[in-house]
A protein has these predicted regions:
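N-terminal positively charged helical leader segments and presequences
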Residues: 1-66
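Mobile, glycine- and charge-enriched loop segments
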Residues: 36, 65-77, 176-183
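Short, acidic/turn-prone active-site loops that include or flank metal/cofactor-
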Residues: 63-64, 167-168, 192-193, 215-218
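RNA substrate-binding interface of SAM-dependent RNA methyltransferases
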Residues: 67-161
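Short amphipathic alpha-helix with an adjacent loop that forms part of the alpha/beta core around
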Residues: 152-156, 173-180
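A C-terminal functional module that forms or caps the active site or interfaces directly
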Residues: 182-202
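Structured adenosyl-cofactor binding patch, chiefly the S-adenosyl-L-methionine
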Residues: 197-227
Length: 227
C-alpha cells in the first residue's frame, strides 16, 4: 500500500501535497475506493480515496500505528557533496533512522552553497528525505537544517563524535557500545579526502571525540551505513 505524508488535517480528512496528488493520479493511477497509508503528526492512518478524478478526498478509515521508536536520536553533520552522492547519503540516513541532518562546509568541500541557492537545495534535500521516509515506512521526516561552516558546529548531543581517518583513535563501534544508553548522538562526517587535522582539532576543542573505522578508509557515502 502506498504511503504519503499529509500537509494538514481537517476533521476526518487529510490534505496532501500537490506532488503526491499528481503521483496518485498520474503515476499510480489509483481509483475511488483505493486505500493508502497517510502519516500525520507521527501517526499512521489507513485512508480511502474518493473523487480521484477531481479534487481528491482522503478520508480516515482507521488509525494504524504510532510514531517511530528510533533511539537514540542521531544528528548527522554531512559535508555538501555532489548531487548523486548527496542524494544517496540522505536516502540511506533517512532509512536508517537519523533524526536531523545538518549540511556542512569544510575546507575540502567541492560544492559551494550561497544564499541564492540555499533554499532551493534544502527544499530538494527535504523532498528526498520525505520520499525515503515513505519508502522505509517511517512516521517522521528528518529535519534538514541550513548549511553551516564546520567551525560553527557545537557539541549539543549526549555523545559527539567526529569521523577521523587516523588509525590511532577509538573504534567507533566501541565508543557507541559504551554509550548505548545515551539519548542523543551527534556525528560529523568528513568530505572526500577527510577532514583536515586543523578541523578535527577544532571539533575536539568544541567537545567532540575522534573515532576511527579501524583499518578501513570508507567512501564518504558509506559512513552512515557503517555507523
Amino acid at each position: 500500500m502506498q504511503r504519503y505524508f499529509a500537509r494538514s488535517k481537517c476533521n476526518n480528512e487529510f490534505i496532501l501535497n500537490e506532488d503526491d496528488i499528481y503521483h496518485i493520479k498520474k503515476v499510480m493511477r489509483m481509483q475511488n475506493g483505493d486505500n493508502i497509508y497517510v502519516v500525520y503528526n507521527e501517526t499512521t492512518y489507513i485512508c480511502e480515496l474518493q473523487n480521484v478524478s477531481h479534487n481528491i478526498t482522503v478520508s480516515i478509515v482507521k488509525e494504524e500505528m504510532k510514531k517511530d521508536d528510533f533511539m537514540p536520536l542521531v544528528t548527522l553533520y554531512v559535508p555538501v557533496l555532489k548531487e548523486q552522492k548527496m542524494d544517496f547519503v540522505l536516502q540511506k540516513a533517512t532509512e536508517l533512522g537519523v533524526a536531523e541532518i545538518v549540511p556542512i562546509i569544510t575546507e575540502r568541500t567541492l560544492i559551494k552553497i550561497n544564499d541564492d541557492n540555499m533554499d532551493k537545495k534544502i527544499t530538494r534535500w527535504t523532498r528526498i528525505c520525505k520520499e525515503a521516509s515513505e519508502q522505509s515506512h517511517r512516521t517522521t521526516i528528518p529535519k534538514i537544517e541550513k548549511v553551516v561552516k564546520i567551525s560553527d558546529i557545537e557539541a549539543i548531543s549526549n555523545v559527539n563524535i567526529v569521523c577521523s581517518t587516523s588509525y590511532k583513535e577509538k573504534n567507533v563501534k566501541y565508543l557507541l557500545q559504551t554509550n548505548k544508553d545515551c539519548d542523543t548522538i551527534g556525528v560529523v562526517m568528513g568530505p572526500e579526502g577527510g577532514l583536515t587535522e586543523k578541523e578535527e582539532e577544532a571539533l575536539v576543542k568544541n567537545g567532540f571525540e575522534r573515532v576511527t573505522f579501524g583499518n578501513r578508509i570508507l567512501r564518504v557515502e558509506t559512513v552512515p551505513l557503517f555507523i
